[in-house]
Swiss-Prot record:
Protein role: Catalyzes the reversible interconversion of serine and glycine with tetrahydrofolate (THF) serving as the one-carbon carrier. This reaction serves as the major source of one-carbon groups required for the biosynthesis of purines, thymidylate, methionine, and other important biomolecules. Also exhibits THF-independent aldolase activity toward beta-hydroxyamino acids, producing glycine and aldehydes, via a retro-aldol mechanism.
Any Gene Ontology CC annotation: cytosol
Molecular-function annotations in GO: glycine hydroxymethyltransferase activity; pyridoxal phosphate binding
Name used for this protein in its record: Serine hydroxymethyltransferase 2
Lineage: Bacteria, Pseudomonadati, Pseudomonadota, Gammaproteobacteria, Pseudomonadales
Record bears the keyword Transferase: yes
Pathway as given in its UniProt record: One-carbon metabolism; tetrahydrofolate interconversion; Amino-acid biosynthesis; glycine biosynthesis; glycine from L-serine: step 1/1
Cofactors, names only: pyridoxal 5'-phosphate
Alphabetized CDD domains for the sequence: SHMT
PROSITE patterns xref list: SHMT
Residues bearing PTM N6-(pyridoxal phosphate)lysine: 230
Keywords: Amino-acid biosynthesis, Cytoplasm, One-carbon metabolism, Pyridoxal phosphate, Transferase
NCBIfam families: PRK00011.1
GO biological-process terms attached to the record: glycine biosynthetic process from serine; tetrahydrofolate interconversion
């Protein structure tokens, strides 16, 4: 029998030590990975609740197990809040991740071998948009579009040309490393021209969309997916949204369960409900605007210091820095910044001569530091420190100096106050 007083401490100190070390790392390091953020204690409370004990295969009111009357209410709250937040008619809150939400869309709308058109991973797309190593590239005939390497922007006429040539059944608009605004009406126009479904993956910008600071794809897309972390600041999880279409709704529901998943994670769905409510609070829009302001200010510092920022800047929460001209690799830059307690991720850039394990770029994002309370002043200072390290790569004295300044800044802006 379990006791309410059971604790990890004293029972599994090896695990607790690793957990505590990670929490301390989050406090002591500046987090600039664009897909990472900090959740509220309310989100964590939901995830650590007794809801983790409940199996609930099926959907509210249509479960395969008994005892679901309360978790039905939890899931329905999450569904209604998601619909309200994004102006959707349909929401499925059960996907365990963004990739599983995307897989459900493929399963619902396509047959194996069908042609899909998505953004190349090397140009800012995502693994699930047709990369050869992903199910999306293994099970489907994946054709890729990219950016114009001169402008750093998507060439929609070129996307249209490719679509006319390959006649995809589905076109994917979305990214993991593209810093400009997607033209959803133009994507809709292209999809209609070739009779394709338009699938928008807004995982990176969902928080900006919810705040009204980035175009909402719902009026244009046949289906939209997102993660619930990143700019939404919720738990790790996925979400599917759509306009009213009973036939497609049934397909999406069946593709999630039983098509790709079994029982939903009710404790995570409760945490999603919390984060959707938080995203409807008045301060959420101000937070998202600060995310954009901080990213734009940081990108400008890199430009002023002589670095190439892909696409020439950013409209959202992230930007890519190309290190090709400096002759540096993303791997070495990532490691040097890590020694100074600044966490970024190496990232491929267009025409990258290096492998994806080495790369010639860095992806930098501001959601986490903005949650921490950083404003433009702190982000400009931070960008300068990063440039100092890149200009003196491998210089231990420079790294140590930056690390001491990072420590002071982190002390001034704790993750949880």
């Amino acid at each position: 029998m379990f006791s309410k007083q059971d604790q990890i401490q004293g029972y599994d100190d090896a695990l607790l030590s690793a957990m505590n070390a990670e929490e301390q790392r989050q406090e002591d390091h500046i987090e600039l990975i664009a897909s990472e953020n900090y959740t509220s204690k309310r989100v964590m409370q939901a995830q650590g609740s007794g809801l983790t004990n409940k199996y609930a295969e099926g959907y509210p009111g249509k479960r395969y197990y008994g005892g679901c009357e309360h978790v039905d209410k939890v899931e329905q709250l999450a569904i209604e809040r998601a619909k309200q937040l994004f102006g959707a008619d349909y929401a499925n809150v059960q996907p365990h991740s963004g990739s599983q939400a995307n897989a459900a869309v493929y399963l619902a709308l396509l047959q194996a071998g069908d042609t899909v058109l998505g953004m190349s991973l090397a140009h800012g797309g995502h693994l699930t948009h047709g990369a050869k190593v992903s199910f999306s590239g293994k099970l489907y005939n994946a054709v890729q579009y990219g950016i114009d390497t001169t402008t750093g922007l998507i060439d929609y006429d070129e996307v249209e040309r490719i679509a006319v040539e390959c006649q995809p059944k589905m076109i994917i608009a979305g990214f993991s490393a593209y810093s400009k605004t997607l033209d959803f009406p133009r994507f809709r126009e292209i999809a209609d021209k070739v009779g394709a479904y338009l699938f928008v993956d807004m995982a990176h910008v969902a928080g900006l969309v919810a705040a009204g600071l980035y175009p909402n794809p719902l009026p244009y897309a046949d289906v939209v997916t997102t993660t619930t972390h990143k700019t939404l600041r919720g738990p790790r999880g996925g979400l599917i949204l759509a306009k009213a279409n009973e036939e497609l709704e049934k397909k999406f529901n069946s593709a999630v369960f039983p098509g790709g998943q079994g029982g939903p994670l009710m404790h995570v769905i409760a945490a999603k409900a919390v984060c959707f409510k938080e995203a409807m609070e008045p301060g959420f829009k101000a937070y998202q605007q600060q995310v954009i302001d901080n990213a734009q200010a940081m990108a400008q510092v890199f430009i002023d210091r002589g670095f190439d920022v892909v696409s020439g800047g950013t409209d959202n929460h992230l930007f890519l820095v190309s290190l090709i001209r400096q002759g540096l690799t993303g791997k070495d830059a990532d490691a040097a910044l890590g020694r100074a307690h600044i966490t970024v991720n190496k990232n491929s850039v267009p025409n990258d001569p290096q492998s994806p394990f080495v790369t010639s770029g860095l992806r930098i994002g501001t959601p986490a530091v903005t949650t921490r309370g950083f404003k433009v002043t702190q982000c400009v200072e931070l960008a300068g420190w990063i440039c100092d390290i890149l200009d003196n790569l491998g210089d231990a004295d420079v790294e140590a100096n930056v690390a001491s300044q990072v420590a002071a800044l982190c002390a001034d802006f704790p993750v949880y106050r």
